[in-house]
Amino acid sequence: MNTIHMIKNDNDPAIAIIPYRSWPVFRLWKLSLDSLEWPLGRPKRLLSGDLRKLKKEDHLITFPRKPVFFFFRNKVKANISLMIVEPDIIHKHYIRLAKIFNWRFYKILSKNQNLIKSINNGKFFYFGSTFLSNINEIDINKKDMASLIASAQNQHPGHKLRHEVITYIKEFKINIAVIGRGYKPFEKKEDGLKSYKYSVIIENSSEVNYFTEKLIDACLLETVPIYWGAPNISDYFDVKGFIICESFEEIKYAISKMSDEDYLSRIKWIKKNKKTASYHADFKKRAAQIIKQSLNN
């Protein structure tokens, strides 16, 4: 069971999240309330049972899967909202389905402005997120220069750019630790960031308003991102604490300028971005707050 944070008024609308890939193909109603996530708290009336106990005033937020759009929701009275968080290049099919079947949802949360403008129940929402836990207990000791975390994936523009940079690093024996499932596996995400002053952060695709735990986790652990990704990232962070790159050549140049002195010159903005990142990290709470605010309008 999830750690329970109780809400004060048991009769207030409850807002819960169905975890990623947990929406069943059949019999949605059988999903246990214990399997849900409760970012804003869980009422006493819902401490046990399944989705049938939810009232028509309650709310569920889910990630997209085909059954979410097409299948019946027998015995489930709660409102259901959809949260599309992956880049358009990956979830373009779900964006198209959301336009067609938006009437099946209370709200549709997405960064895709075309989708939001085309439906009446769209709400702007960006992803963010984090892979870290117990951040205050992580020992941050910047004794190493730089890292690059990568998997073996190679289908999207960011994947390809990542591997191109890695080839360059290895060929010229540059002082950057290349780690991750595709190279040198590590146990915890923080192991690839906590001791490094810089990290080459390349999103899987470059899309407006799309940034992920790749960037958030670097900021949370006071690592300067050499960043390729959202072209409007300055809307979310103070980029004086970043090195923004738009190409392979710019990444190469940024790498050549790494130094202890440069890192120390950015400390003010590194600390500022750490605080900002803590807000962007909790995307589930932000999603639940959007639903809650809509009830008060």
Describe each region flagged by the PLM.
Residues 3-84, 88, 92-178, 182, ...:
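Pol beta-like nucleotidyltransferase catalytic core
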